[in-house]
Structure formats: structure tokens, C-alpha cells
Swiss-Prot record:
Record note on quaternary structure: Interacts with GPR61, GPR62 and GPR135.
SMART domains, A to Z: 7TM_GPCR_Srsx
Positions bound to melatonin: N175, Q194
GO cellular component: plasma membrane; synapse
UniProt key word Disulfide bond: yes
Lineage: Eukaryota, Metazoa, Chordata, Craniata, Vertebrata
Gene3D superfamilies per record: Rhodopsin 7-helix transmembrane proteins
Protein name per its UniProtKB record: Melatonin receptor type 1B
CDD domains, A to Z: 7tmA_Mel1B (cd15400)
Keyword line: Cell membrane, Disulfide bond, G-protein coupled receptor, Glycoprotein, Membrane, Receptor, Transducer, Transmembrane, Transmembrane helix
Primary localization: membrane
Protein family: Belongs to the G-protein coupled receptor 1 family.
Length: 362
């Protein structure tokens, strides 16, 4: 397939980057040595598995929240937003990477390359901001329960989510001015090129990874302190009253945060090292480490739905109902009608001082 204009001068068949003056982490090997033979099959396997689990798992998350009244609350709207952030990469960037692997180079033109890299960034930054918002939500819910319903009213949460995605788009706009969205032949992907601007790379790592990690860590550390105090009854006069479901909710989101940090830390550490000293550090980054860091980052998009199913009974139960409905629609329609009638007889619990007013918050 023919490529247009300047993009055709950037990459040759086989993925070789030949743009002059483009060195380091974002470029191809100066000696044009072949890629390690494991890269294409490993990346293909990871992307195929990740895409399949990503689509099925995150659609299950979204449908579970929409179908189940116990899951339909302010906190879980952020989970739907996070699921959408994970879902977009499965529908556009990942299939395009598989096409690049098949052709041994980018064959879809510059427009698709820029769009694919933008959607990838949308997913990553959107995930970071949503995970941060979830941590703040859990922090307010447990540590400032008196003010929780004032902060997260029914119409406030959608506004918070819209603000998250607006900030995500704004955060990505500088990439078009810096020229950092390009094809990287080592990973067959159009992505963020770390050596396009070392100052911008450092800013991205600090603002979109280290700072959110610090905020989330603070929120969860404060929650852990209160949880331990409540369990040890260190403060008998405290009005904190945690139900097991509250603890499971917090634990689930804490695990999601830890997994995200583990999956994205290697790539961000590489980016920070390259930004500090691009001339010396970029050529010294082992290609196997660089590719593996991307494989780990790509794999993260399919893990959240699995965590919800493993750690949360309400999600696990709803997953089973949805899958059973797909397998045997008639049987599940009858069960759903009975279940909806039973739920309709239950009025929502009034707000209770403390943290027990959302027993099944996740």
C-alpha cells in the first residue's frame, strides 16, 4: 500500500526509520541490524490475547454497571469511564499494530499513524486520570464521608468524568506541536517518541505519571491508616464504620492502581532516563527491555475487568448473568424479570453518617 508525502520518507519497508537526525529511543538501529526474532511473535501474541480479553472484559464491566442497581452508583461511573479508556485501544491502535507486524512495517499512511498514536495516548492518559479520580473518590468516601454526598451528587459525577476527558485531550495536544507522535519500528507501533523533545518527555513523565502516582498513593495511604485504626479499634470514639464490602471495594481499586503502576513504571523509567541524558542513555537502553516494557504496558488494558471479577462478588455475579444470558437468553429473561421486580421493592438506603452508606460501592 502506498504511503504519502513525508511519512514515506520516514520509514522504509521492514520498519527501518531513515529520517535524518532522529536518534535514540524513538529511532531504528543505526546499523540496521535485524530485529530480535522473538519481537514479532511475542508482540502479536500479547496483542491478540489482550485485545480479546480487553473487549470482552470491559464490555462486561460496562454492562454490569448498567444492568445491576447495586453497581449503579457514583463511584462505579468512574469504572465505566476507565473501562472505556481501556476499550478504545482494542478497537483501533492494537489492530493497526497487528497489520504493521503482518507487513513488517507501517503500511497505512501518516494519518492513521497520527490517529493511532493519539488514541493510544487518549487511553493511557485517560486511564491515569480516571485511576486518580477513583482514588480521590474512595478517599472522600472513607476519610470524609460527611462531605461525600455533597461532592459526588448524582449530576456532579458525570461532570467530573467530562472534565477528566477534557483534560486528557488538552494534555495530548502538545504532541502535535512537538512532533512526538511517530512510528517506532522496534515495536511496530505509532506511539509517543521519547527523544522528540527531552524536556517534553520529562514533563509528561512527571505530570502524567509521577504526580498522579503521588496523589493516589497519598489517598490510599490515608485510607489504609483509617482502615487499620478501625480494625484495631484504636479510636473507640471514631465514627468510622467499615463493612466488609467497603473494604473489598477499597482493596479492589488499590489492586487496580498497583497493577497499573507496575505495568507502566518500566516504560516511564526509560522515558525519564532518556530525558535526563538522551545522548548517552538512549543508545544504552537494551532493545529487549524497551520492547518488554511496551508489552507490559499494552497488556495492562485487559487486566482491570479480571480484577473486578476476582475480587468483587457483585461484578462476578453480574458477569455470570450476562454470559448466561448470551448462552441461554430465554432462561435469563425470566430470571431478570424476577430479579428486577424484587429489586424494585427495595428502596434505596438513606445516607448514614460514616462510611457504611454504600455497602456495595463497587
Amino acid at each position: 500500500m502506498s504511503e504519502n508525502g513525508s511519512f514515506a520518507n520516514c520509514c522504509e519497508a521492514g520498519g527501518w526509520a531513515v529520517r535524518p537526525g532522529w536518534s535514540g529511543a524513538g529511532s531504528a538501529r543505526p546499523s540496521r541490524t535485524p530485529r530480535p526474532p522473538w519481537v514479532a511473535p511475542a508482540l502479536s501474541a500479547v496483542l491478540i490475547v489482550t485485545t480479546a480479553v480487553d473487549v470482552v472484559g470491559n464490555l462486561l464491566v460496562i454492562l454490569s454497571v448498567l444492568r445491576n442497581r447495586k453497581l449503579r452508583n457514583a463511584g462505579n461511573l468512574f469504572l465505566v469511564s476507565l473501562a472505556l479508556a481501556d476499550l478504545v485501544v482494542a478497537f483501533y491502535p492494537y489492530p493497526l499494530i497487528l497489520v504493521a507486524i503482518f507487513y513488517d512495517g507501517w503500511a497505512l499512511g501518516e494519518e492513521h499513524c497520527k490517529a493511532s498514536a493519539f488514541v493510544m495516548g487518549l487511553s493511557v492518559i485517560g486511564s491515569v486520570f480516571n485511576i486518580t479520580a477513583i482514588a480521590i473518590n474512595r478517599y472522600c468516601y472513607i476519610c470524609h464521608s460527611m462531605a461525600y454526598h455533597r461532592i459526588y451528587r448524582r449530576w456532579h459525577t458525570p461532570l467530573h468524568i467530562c472534565l477528566i476527558w477534557l483534560l486528557t485531550v488538552v494534555a495530548l495536544l502538545p504532541n502535535f506541536f512537538v512532533g512526538s507522535l511517530e512510528y517506532d519500528p522496534r515495536i511496530y507501533s505509532c506511539t509517543f517518541i521519547q527523544t522528540a523533545s527531552t524536556q517534553y518527555t520529562a514533563a509528561v513523565v512527571v505530570i502524567h505519571f509521577l504526580l498522579p502516582i503521588a496523589v493516589v498513593s497519598f489517598c490510599y495511604l490515608r485510607i489504609w491508616v483509617l482502615v487499620l485504626q478501625a480494625r484495631r479499634k484504636a479510636k473507640p470514639e471514631s465514627r468510622l464504620c467499615l463493612k466488609p464490602s467497603d473494604l473489598r471495594s477499597f482493596l479492589t481499586m488499590f489492586v487496580v492502581f498497583v497493577i497499573f503502576a507496575i505495568c507502566w513504571a518500566p516504560l516511564n523509567c526509560i522515558g525519564l532516563a532518556v530525558a535526563i541524558n538522551p545522548q548517552e542513555m538512549a543508545p544504552q537502553i537494551p532493545e529487549g527491555l524497551f520492547v518488554t516494557s511496551y508489552l507490559l504496558a499494552y497488556f495492562n488494558s485487559c487486566l482491570n475487568a479480571i480484577v473486578y471479577g476476582l475480587l468483587n462478588q457483585n461484578f462476578r455475579r453480574e458477569y455470570k448473568r450476562i454470559l448466561l444470558a448470551l448462552w441461554n437468553p430465554r432462561h435469563c429473561i425470566q430470571d431478570a424479570s424476577k430479579g428486577s421486580h424484587a429489586e424494585g421493592l427495595q428502596s434505596p438506603a438513606p445516607p448514614i453518617i460514616g462510611v457504611q452508606h454504600q455497602a456495595d460501592a463497587l
